[in-house]
Amino acid sequence: MIYTSDKMEEAAVLDAAQLMCAAARTAPKTRGIDNVRTLVLTGDDILALADKMEETDLRLNNGERTFLSRDAGNLRRSKAVVLVGIEKKPYGLNCGYCGFEGCAACVEGKGTCFFCGTDLGIAVSSAVSTAANLRIDCRVMFSIGRCAAEMSYAEGNTIWLGIPLSTSGKNPYFDRK
């Protein structure tokens, strides 16, 4: 049997995406509370998210195209995207690091617990280091996560970051314009 480079690279990207999800899941977390969520999108689901990014760009920027449309173009050239999210809820430490008096005030004021961002960052770092170890091109994009939050991929209030994946002769995420 002959395996073409296209098929092998596509399989490598999906294998990497699985391992990235595992790395995000097993990353250290505040108080050991696991609020991490992961998803992998391919094919038409990538295109739908890219469309959402372009629609959001035009809506937020008075019909002008900005970085959201640029990033949507990067997403369209990706074989897969790993979404890593964290459920937006306080961790019960009442530390006030969020800027509120405590967790109840944070919830009432619709704030974001400091540890949500911390845990999301650690999980994403674990995921992208896995991709790097496997020589899969990737880039962390808040723009993808911003628009993924509008797609209702998960119940509740989730903060997402997107990690598009590629295997091409040149990293498409390197010199974006």
Predicted regions, residues:
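Acidic, surface-exposed loops and disordered segments
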Residues: 1-177
